[in-house]
């Protein structure tokens, strides 16, 4: 009771689950024993009251916790520009640094390393907003670089955007998969974004961080 799990991350040793209602990360061992928050604190006093872990992802040995604003029941998120934070923790739940704060974040949930084969800057990340359906590009240091765009230079928008994935073993490396819940999550959609083949149609209307249009890079 009093628990609303929104996302999870799995390592070889532990299972980490984002409890949106309780504004905490629950850690379970690989034998499903709940661990003490003393040993896995996942604490950051600088996160404003009313924000809670919305998802947690494991990337390159680190845990990225994505925060969204709670509604009155602490069951669902409150969408809005700037309603989001991202922190980096080690696997013991110790805060390492703030990755991103507010700005373009709007109930962020999905996060993956940006595939270099899609012309994104090396070491960058893609962060999907559930709140507004945009996919943001961040540098390895957490600087916002722009949004993912289509071949015409318009921001790609996927209503109810949840998960992002790229380069699974069975796929080609220039495909980004997504899952979403459009129509206020009444429906479900799984799809993919694919880098358009070269040569691309120059001049680019907006070449910055456009996986379909790498000509004349910024």
Model-flagged regions — what are they?
Residues 1-199:
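Sequence/structural signature of beta-propeller domains
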């Amino acid at each position: 009771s009093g628990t609303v799990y929104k996302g999870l991350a799995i390592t070889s040793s532990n299972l980490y689950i984002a409890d949106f209602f309780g504004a905490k990360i629950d850690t379970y061992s690989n034998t499903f024993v709940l661990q003490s928050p003393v040993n896995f604190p996942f604490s950051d006093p600088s996160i404003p009251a009313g924000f809670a872990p919305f998802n947690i992802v494991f990337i390159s040995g680190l845990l990225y916790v994505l925060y969204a604003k709670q509604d009155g029941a602490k069951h669902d998120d409150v969408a809005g520009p700037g309603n989001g934070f991202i922190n980096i923790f080690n696997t013991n739940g110790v805060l390492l640094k703030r990755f991103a704060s507010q700005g373009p974040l709007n109930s962020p949930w999905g996060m993956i390393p940006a595939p270099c084969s899609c012309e994104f800057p090396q070491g960058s990340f893609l962060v999907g907003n559930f709140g507004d359906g945009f996919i943001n590009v961040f540098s390895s240091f957490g600087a916002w670089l722009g949004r993912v765009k289509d071949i015409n230079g318009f921001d790609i928008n996927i209503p109810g955007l949840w998960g992002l994935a790229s380069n699974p073993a069975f796929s080609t490396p220039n495909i980004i998969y997504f899952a979403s819940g459009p129509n206020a999550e009444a429906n479900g959609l799984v799809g993919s974004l694919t880098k358009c083949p070269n040569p691309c149609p120059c001049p680019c209307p907006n070449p910055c961080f456009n996986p379909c249009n790498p000509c004349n890079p910024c």
